[in-house]
Amino acid sequence: MNQYIENSNFIYIPKFIFPERANQLAKEFLEFVEKYDIKDDVQVENSQSYQNFVGFLELLCEKTPEVTKFLGETVLPTYTYARVYKNGNELTRHTDRHACEVSLTLQLKKDHDWPIYIKKPNGESVGIDLDSGDAIMYLGCEAEHWREKFEGTEYVQVFLHYVRSR
């Protein structure tokens, strides 16, 4: 495994996708959410979410070799989960289920900075702001992660989830 990830539980990946592609994916997802009247998310009240939107599944599979390279171990794609956060939303501190062993949170569109916090193995917490197309790859089952109350209007992001191959 990549030593940096092992020592910090995460790695910041600037421009994981081009900002233009991030904006286009956000536009497509927001249109989908509106067209199909996607309702509130169960984990984050007053946000909208959807699992395995086709544009994100394509990205999940396309990026598997790159994620494998960053991690230094072969990964298998499991699923995607996208969420549209609204003013006042927060993501409580948690770890993920086994299908999210290696996860990326990818920023697609925002109107306000909103760091994701990750707890490192030494107990230190680090907050990272992402721009459109930037990602954080982290060990979802090991690293507690969260977001404090969102002060903007809208924040669109997608999680890309993987597991390590045997």
Positions of PLM-derived features:
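A short coil-to-beta-strand element that immediately follows conserved catalytic motifs
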Residues: 72-81
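Conserved active-site beta-strand element of glycosyltransferases/polysaccharide synthases
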Residues: 84
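Short linear sequence motifs
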Residues: 43-46, 78, 87, 155
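Non-heme Fe(II)/2-oxoglutarate
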Residues: 1-71
